[in-house]
Design a protein with these regions (language model features):
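Short, compositionally biased serine/threonine- and acidic-rich segments at solvent-exposed termini, linkers
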Residues: 1-109
Length: 109
């Protein structure tokens, strides 16, 4: 005899994507707000900043929620004067990375 055949199971893993990201400054504090889709597959976010646009360093770690579909996240930081560039590294539960666009904040002198 022959062995019975079964349909092959495939697992699809939807990856989270940035819907929007914006940065504002008020009262010497930067506020970054970002929205993502497929939120339940996001693990964490690394908020990175740079003064020269080339060398980014970790400013904060934000953990994802288990909320289904989309969700919004925020980051606040006190800043001095000058130009600061921010980007967000999204790390999903499969350890895949995606970077947001870069947000430029100009703090008053």
């Amino acid at each position: 005899g022959s062995l019975p055949s079964f349909p092959q199971a495939t697992t699809t893993f939807s990856t989270p994507k940035f819907i929007s990201i914006e940065g504002k400054i008020s009262n010497e504090k930067v506020k970054l707000t970002w929205n993502i889709s497929e939120n339940e597959t996001a693990d964490k976010f690394e908020v990175e900043k740079s003064s020269d646009g080339g060398n980014f360093s970790l400013a904060a770690l934000v953990f994802g929620t288990d909320k289904m579909s989309s969700d919004q996240y925020q980051f606040y930081e006190k800043v001095n004067s000058g130009k600061i560039l921010y980007r967000i590294k999204l790390i999903n539960k499969n350890k895949e990375l995606e970077y947001s666009k870069i947000i430029e904040i100009n703090a008053g002198a």
